[in-house]
Amino acid sequence: MNAATPNPHISLEADAATRNTDWAAQGLARFERHFSTGQTPTAEVDGAQRLLFSSSNYLGLAEDPIVIDAAINAARTLGAGSGGSRLTTGTLDAHRQLEAHLAGFFNYPSAVFFATGYQANLSTISAIVGKRGDDFEIFSDQYNHASIIDGARIARARVRVFKHCDYDDLEAQLATRTRPHALVISDGLFSMHGTCADVPRIVELARSYGAWSYIDDAHGVGTLGPTGRGTCELQGAWPDVLVGTASKALGGEGGYACCGPEVATLLRNQARSYVFSTSNSPMVIAAVDAALSRVDAALVSRLQSRARLLRELLRAAGVGVAGLEQSAIIPVHVGDELLAVEAAAALQDRGIQAPAIRYPTVPRGQAILRLTVMATHSDEQVKECARVLAEIFENLGLTRPVE
């Protein structure tokens, strides 16, 4: 066997430095922002007070006193950590109680809770496929979350990507399916676009073509539907598997899959992150359980009214916004990556925290500012955000004629 010709030796640090320089030259370098306060409407970010319009704490439950008290009480009675994975010592009564609460909340027979939302998708998809990759096709929306993309990859099934929310394209691909098992997967509310999947159409097409349906509604739960049960409640259709996260509207961390009892048993035995990850701490589980009880129609309505107000104000100022009207995610179109970074920096200088979203999170040349609202924002804070953003966009030549 011939040995590969070695490259001239450079240190790993030097190699990384070259790649980092190239990444930055494309306007793609990212930096962590340091918070000295919680995820509140006014937060201290990098040592400065700013209006926070970038948090996924949509309902403000991360700071809810009842939620915090639940976490404190759990720590005092059950300790700071779970002590093991779910199949060893890491399943407390609190874990099973939360899973039952989630199943009842969404009206599914069962629910399985994972350490993160990312792990929930990664492991649920691969567990459903199992060792049948050669006999399995996954049909995935082109703008699905990275955790879905990665889950489909490690499942080793054939992955077929359909155009974003184009269900004629999905049906055309389903009609040419060649493998016996199939799974149709989509985000519910798309995190970077603010658009919604057509869940009834997905469920109907999957059933018509002998496939299973799977929706990840991480950003829809707590923000959409009359009572905050998400995209599926809003549209009146429910998939075979509903995945979500506790790290957005519920103000905590962790992920879950709602499903039938046999699928739940499969996940508990074959979902690798469930089997091999230490389970969430008692504090997290208690906080999420309490937060779930705090989701109600009034809180959701308040959030949706804030979202509508910000959209209306931005449109009136000639700022291009996208997404579902009541969605808490408000993508503001920029296009050029470097210009998006400049706009985000100008917002920070004016006391508003809202990030530029660039490749690889969105396609090249489609950079956005991603605004998110919280139910805890006041009307005055929403108006201030709109006013400042409109002024910055006008200065950068990014405003459009008002129709």
Residue locations for each model-derived region?
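N-terminal "arm"/small-domain region of PLP-dependent enzymes with the aminotransferase-like
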Residues: D15-L78, A211
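Short loop-beta-helix segment that forms the pyridoxal 5′-phosphate
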Residues: S85-T89, E99-S123
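Conserved PLP-anchoring active-site segment centered on the Schiff-base-forming lysine
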Residues: I125-A146
